[in-house]
């Protein structure tokens, strides 16, 4: 066997892969249709979501990621880095008008180090601390639709293929409270805080796995961090108090309404024996 030939082939493959990712980095992962991936490389796949036959596997997720970019800078070209699965954990490093480039050096998301732990849900008395918390008024909820967006992102991050636009349209925010480390004057300035934690109580979306009907009030926490140096927006969120699989008998589970509903709709069933929540995340570029 000619080991020299094998070594040379491997070096050529590594060089081709490095060149491919160099070209992607130069384009910041936008307009990549003309960049061809070498054989065997892990490639980015472009989708034209305006075409009826684009067949993106998660169209609702694309819509919400685009909304996250619009929320960041109200612009049109968005790069979203999904850091983990099973909960909301994303960074939006780019949000700008489509076709516009900058001469600034792109700062990778890995350089934006943030804690991935959420705070505990505060006690009822703690919410009365006006120097830390601000209870969002009903009129302010209507004028700050990013709060609803955060909730939708959390639900989609956890349920992903099991949720639709029609499901999200049923959501009703019962109460939203914003916490900041520093006191802000006037208090509603917390709505614009670059670093904040949002506590949301909501209803309208049933969850058979925790025996929760549409009128059952559920809780979500979302932490927002905007880094002024890098321009990166970080969103971390999860549902609170919803341990999905605790002391479940297999016979009971596989005959449960939740499991049968997944099978009926040809969805991959969620179970404690098919745990797919551990992963490395993904990167989505949206034009």
Swiss-Prot record:
Q: Which domain of life is it from?
A: Eukaryota
Cross-referenced InterPro entries: MS5
Q: Which family does it belong to?
A: Belongs to the UPF0725 (EMB2204) family.
- Name of the molecule in the record: UPF0725 protein At1g19060
């Amino acid at each position: 066997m000619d080991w020299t030939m094998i070594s040379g082939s491997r070096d050529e493959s590594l060089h081709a892969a490095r060149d491919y990712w160099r070209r992607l980095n130069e384009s910041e992962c936008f307009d990549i249709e003309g960049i061809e991936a070498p054989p065997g490389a892990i490639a980015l796949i472009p989708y034209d979501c305006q075409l009826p036959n684009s067949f993106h596997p998660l169209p609702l997720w694309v819509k919400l990621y685009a909304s996250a970019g619009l929320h960041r800078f109200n612009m049109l070209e968005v790069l979203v880095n999904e850091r983990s699965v099973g909960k909301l954990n994303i960074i939006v490093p780019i949000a700008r008008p489509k076709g516009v480039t900058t001469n600034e050096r792109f700062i990778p998301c890995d350089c934006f180090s943030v804690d991935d732990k959420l705070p505990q849900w505060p006690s009822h008395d703690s919410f009365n601390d006006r120097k830390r918390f601000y209870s969002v008024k009903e009129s302010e909820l209507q004028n700050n639709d990013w709060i609803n967006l955060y909730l939708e992102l959390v639900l989609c991050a956890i349920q992903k293929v099991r949720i639709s636009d029609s499901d999200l349209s049923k959501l009703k925010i019962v109460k939203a409270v914003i916490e900041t480390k520093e006191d802000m004057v006037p208090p509603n300035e917390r709505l614009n805080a670059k670093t904040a934690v949002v506590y949301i109580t909501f209803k309208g979306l049933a969850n058979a796995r925790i025996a929760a009907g549409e009128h059952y009030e559920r809780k979500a926490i979302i932490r927002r961090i905007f880094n002024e140096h890098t321009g990166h927006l970080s969103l971390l969120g999860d549902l609170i108090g919803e341990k999905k699989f605790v002391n479940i008998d297999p016979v009971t589970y596989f005959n449960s309404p939740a499991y049968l509903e997944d099978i009926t709709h040809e969805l991959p069933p969620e179970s404690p024996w098919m745990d797919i929540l551990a992963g490395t995340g993904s990167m989505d570029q949206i034009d």
